[in-house]
Amino acid sequence: MDYPGNLFVVAAPSGAGKSSLVKALMELDSAIQPAVSHTTRPPRGQEKHGREYFFLSPEEFDSMVQRDAFLEWAHVHGHRYGTSRQAIEERIAHGKDVILEIDFQGAINIKRIFSNAVLIFILPPSWEELRSRLQRRGEDSPEVIELRLKNAATEMAQAREFDFVIINELFERAVFDLKTIVHAQRLKFSAQRRARAETFRALQIP
């Protein structure tokens, strides 16, 4: 189905800076709305229920799975993550632009359902920098960091499945790149015809 709104799906290996980039984009672009995922993992730091994630018990997550409430869900780093079907469909059906942070498995699954979804993959500039960022975050044991790096190799091998790739070396440049992708999507013929329907009619453009 062709929805009037845009769905931007951002994925990255842990530590690449995905969440920081999406947060910065939304501070610059009030027209784009976040799609908050559900997860069984515990909150980190200052994360709040309903802002970064909806934090669920395994039983609550199971209930949503049984109700087919998720557009997709997957196991990631020992926890489960899911995307609400209703929340996404309602927003883009009403012409809203939605951005979703998700793992690479979920991104590819969503593309199968929403063929017009724009998939964006965030890469670190090097393995050394990725390791350094995970260590500076101070949230994981050395064993968990090694597991995340191992998973990152698998995830980054899937980058070819995405529409756009951003290398997050200089943060300000990466934010600019992300904003540029969003803006370019809004300038596509189909998007402009919907957004400026009166102008298109006046110019007799079918």
Swiss-Prot record:
Keyword annotations: ATP-binding, Cytoplasm, Kinase, Nucleotide-binding, Transferase
GO molecular function terms noted in the UniProt entry: ATP binding; guanylate kinase activity
Domain Guanylate kinase-like: 5-183
EC number(s) on file: 2.7.4.8
Residues where ATP binds: A12, P13, S14, G15, A16, G17, K18, S19
Location within or outside the cell: Cytoplasm
Catalytic activity of the protein: GMP + ATP = GDP + ADP
Organism domain of life: Bacteria
Key word Transmembrane present: no
Keyword Kinase among UniProt keywords: yes
InterPro entries noted in UniProt: GK/Ca_channel_bsu, Guanylate_kin-like_dom, Guanylate_kinase, Guanylate_kinase_CS, P-loop_NTPase
UniProt xrefs under PROSITE patterns: GUANYLATE_KINASE_1, GUANYLATE_KINASE_2
Its job: Essential for recycling GMP and indirectly, cGMP.
NCBIfam families: guanyl_kin (TIGR03263)
PANTHER family per record: GUANYLATE KINASE, GUANYLATE KINASE-RELATED
Name of the protein: Guanylate kinase
